[in-house]
């Protein structure tokens, strides 16, 4: 097989979802939950060909008989056996490729511990025998996907949010802020406020329903107090949602109360800055000369930035914090749910990137530490 025919694989491992596909494509081929499920009661059904572990959608659909585990918490891998299962499933079942034939680009959370990057590298070369691999920082890929090399990325997924300032393609590690507030917390918050309305959602299965309600109906208010007044005085913002059993529920103020937590974490008892303030704090930790470039390029990325109205609200809030004359631009690309993956697809297919891969030979010579020399 000629060198040119080999498409690199791009795999973005998020806390909630794995996004995987081939470099050069404009969207991931496989998107599935980052879950590994193991049977709670083994050996009940002899001869049923029960597997010892299920991954992704299959684990989700059989969740009644399984114990579900998320190997990635707050963006960082903490269970390598399960993570290996997820990668195995990605290559062999979802993409149906032999990993020993393709270079693999993986993504990592900002400030991922050094030992973790080494472990990822080791698994790719030793377990999957990849010919080459690379580890890229998620936020940087999102910035590339938006066609920029300088800006500040607010990346908010299911398990963690980060504000990452990037200048000429390099992250500024001292100014990165992590906020353990993301999609899962918003879903939990919506479960709680729906309970106040008299609807009860408690199990993990019901959490998935609430997540769907959140994704379909929630939005960010430009002015929270004013929106509350509107909600009290009229039914204009009420929407109905049909549950799987056919029951129809109505939700009003909950629609914008749910994601308001991103701006006011105190709503769920968190002592943390909102995403607007974290973005501002991140910018203020950077050199005074580059702040103007960051204010003018605030890029939203990740599934938890998909709420309608979030861009305008971010713009309003950052404008209120920034110096008066500062020009502020918040960019919310329509494909931002997958922009990390898309950035990886762009990067891995660049001709200039081809000398950046860590090859199997380099790994064999230097060991896992090679990742710190070649991946920034």
From Swiss-Prot:
Its EC number is 3.6.4.-. PANTHER family: ACTIN (PTHR11937). Actins are highly conserved proteins that are involved in various types of cell motility and are ubiquitously expressed in all eukaryotic cells. Essential component of cell cytoskeleton; plays an important role in cytoplasmic streaming, cell shape determination, cell division, organelle movement and extension growth. Pfam families: Actin. Belongs to the actin family. It is found in: Cytoplasm, Cytoskeleton. It catalyses: ATP + H2O = ADP + phosphate + H(+). Its main location: cytoplasm. GO terms for cellular component: cytoplasm; cytoskeleton. It comes from the Eukaryota. There are at least eight actin genes in rice. Keywords: ATP-binding, Cytoplasm, Cytoskeleton, Hydrolase, Nucleotide-binding. One of its GO terms (molecular function) is ATP binding. This is Actin-7.
